[in-house]
């Protein structure tokens, strides 16, 4: 797993959140009535109409070269270490999604040994991706929620007392 792949995944998350925000703003702006002297962006009448709920999107990332600093080898240094795997889906944007998988059921102590009295659990983040839909000769994209495991953490185990 490279830092570049992690950076691209993070950038795609932010892009999808921005798309959702823009779609929401478009919807709320359409419902507002401008006050006297106030104007909202209005599409020229010569422009073709766009179907309700659709949005034109350029998938290029404006600041793609901007780097987000990442901690070095955090997945190996954690008391709950994990490995990365890449899932691939050609009908999803992004087509590559990086997932973390916990290495142990227990946590790693200061001596590097697994402590089975603690639990290693996944940290999950719900994110939005674009799902490609084929309709005859045309292709469209629809937002889809995806649960991504981004790392693991060490927790005290749940203890159930039987009475």
From Swiss-Prot:
Major location category of this protein: secreted
Role, per record: Effector cytokine of innate and adaptive immune system involved in antimicrobial host defense and maintenance of tissue integrity. IL17A-IL17F signals via IL17RA-IL17RC heterodimeric receptor complex, triggering homotypic interaction of IL17RA and IL17RC chains with TRAF3IP2 adapter through SEFIR domains. This leads to downstream TRAF6-mediated activation of NF-kappa-B and MAPkinase pathways ultimately resulting in transcriptional activation of cytokines, chemokines, antimicrobial peptides and matrix metalloproteinases, with potential strong immune inflammation.
Subcellular localization(s) per the UniProt record: Secreted
Record has Repeat as a keyword: no
Top-level taxon of the source organism: Eukaryota
Statement: the UniProt record of this protein carries the keyword Chaperone: no
Signal sequence, start to end: 1-30
GO cellular component: extracellular space
GO molecular function, one term: cytokine activity
Organism listed in the record: Callithrix jacchus (White-tufted-ear marmoset)
Annotated disulfide bonds: 102-152, 107-154
Similarity comment text for this entry: Belongs to the IL-17 family.
Subunit structure: Homodimer; disulfide-linked. Heterodimer with IL17A (IL17A-IL17F). Forms complexes with IL17RA and IL17RC receptors with 2:1 binding stoichiometry: two receptor chains for one interleukin molecule. IL17F homodimer forms predominantly complexes with IL17RC homodimer, whereas IL17A-IL17F favors complexes with IL17RA-IL17RC. IL17RA and IL17RC chains cannot distinguish between IL17A and IL17F molecules, potentially enabling the formation of topologically distinct complexes.
Glycan attachment points: 83
Record-given protein name: Interleukin-17F
GO annotation, biological process: adaptive immune response; inflammatory response; innate immune response
Keywords carried by this UniProt record: Adaptive immunity, Cytokine, Disulfide bond, Glycoprotein, Immunity, Inflammatory response, Innate immunity, Secreted, Signal
């Amino acid at each position: 797993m490279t830092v570049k792949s992690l950076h691209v995944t993070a950038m795609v998350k932010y892009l999808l959140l921005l798309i959702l925000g823009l779609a929401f703003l478009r919807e709320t702006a359409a419902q507002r009535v401008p006050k006297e002297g106030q104007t909202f962006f209005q599409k020229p009448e010569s422009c073709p109409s766009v179907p309700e709920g659709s949005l034109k999107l350029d998938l290029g990332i404006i600041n793609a070269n901007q780097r987000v600093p990442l901690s070095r080898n955090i997945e190996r240094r954690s008391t709950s270490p994990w490995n990365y795997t890449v899932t691939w889906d050609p009908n999803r944007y992004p087509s590559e999604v990086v997932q973390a998988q916990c290495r142990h059921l227990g946590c790693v102590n200061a001596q590097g040994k697994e402590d089975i009295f603690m639990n290693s659990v996944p940290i999950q983040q719900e994110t939005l991706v674009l799902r490609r839909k084929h309709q005859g000769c045309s292709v469209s994209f629809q937002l889809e929620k995806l649960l991504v495991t981004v790392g693991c953490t060490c927790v005290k185990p749940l203890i159930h007392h039987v009475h």
